[in-house]
Amino acid sequence: MNSKKRAYVSVYNKERIVEFCQYLVEYGYEIVATEGTCKVLTEAGIKAISAHELTGYPEPLGGKIRALHPAIYTGIIANELSEEQLSELGDKDIYPIELVVVNCYPFVEDMEAGVDFKEAASHIDSNGVALLNAAAKNYLHTVVVCDPDDYDRVLCDLAAGAI
């Protein structure tokens, strides 16, 4: 089993994501990211693995189904204290994901700003919601970060060894 910690990053709001991920790398995290986020990170010199590269499966439907793959979803939801689950992950070459950084498309803000409903609805983020739900379900073993305003707090907790 891979001893490196893994973070999954999929953000619509890319504000401060480069700085945040740089610190995650310094704290020993391997970054896995959706295509757009991965591009931003790698262009900034941060080593990141695309979800496509991890799963060996391209993002179908123009990226509408990015993360709903067992190699990602199972890695998030697995209990790292369960030898049985860790063994199953190892058998399938899946690694735990300890930190999930996801923020979703701002559907409500678009609607409030008067964006056409069909246009706004086409951007509803089902992937991000599923990832956040999986991480929340595994709250004892997975850190969930869904707001860039929380980056500093998470980094402080990492520095203090609280995570």
Say what each PLM segment does.
Residues 31, 44-49, 62-68, 139-146, ...:
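Short, exposed beta-strand "edge-strand" segments with a Pro/Gly-rich flavor and a Y/T-containing core
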Residues 9, 30-35, 50-53, 78, ...:
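General beta-strand structural signal in soluble alpha/beta enzymes
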Residues 36-106:
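Glycine-rich nucleotide/cofactor/substrate-binding loop typically near the N-terminus or early
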Residues 2-6, 18, 23-26, 94-163:
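Internal alpha/beta core interface subdomains
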Residues 33, 61, 85, 127-129, ...:
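Sparse, context-dependent recognition of short Cys/His-centered cofactor- or disulfide-binding micro-motifs
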Residues 1-33, 37-54:
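N-terminal glycine-/serine-/threonine-rich phosphate-binding loop
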Residues 32, 71, 124:
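Short glycine- and Lys/Arg-enriched binding-loop motifs that mark or flank ligand-binding interfaces
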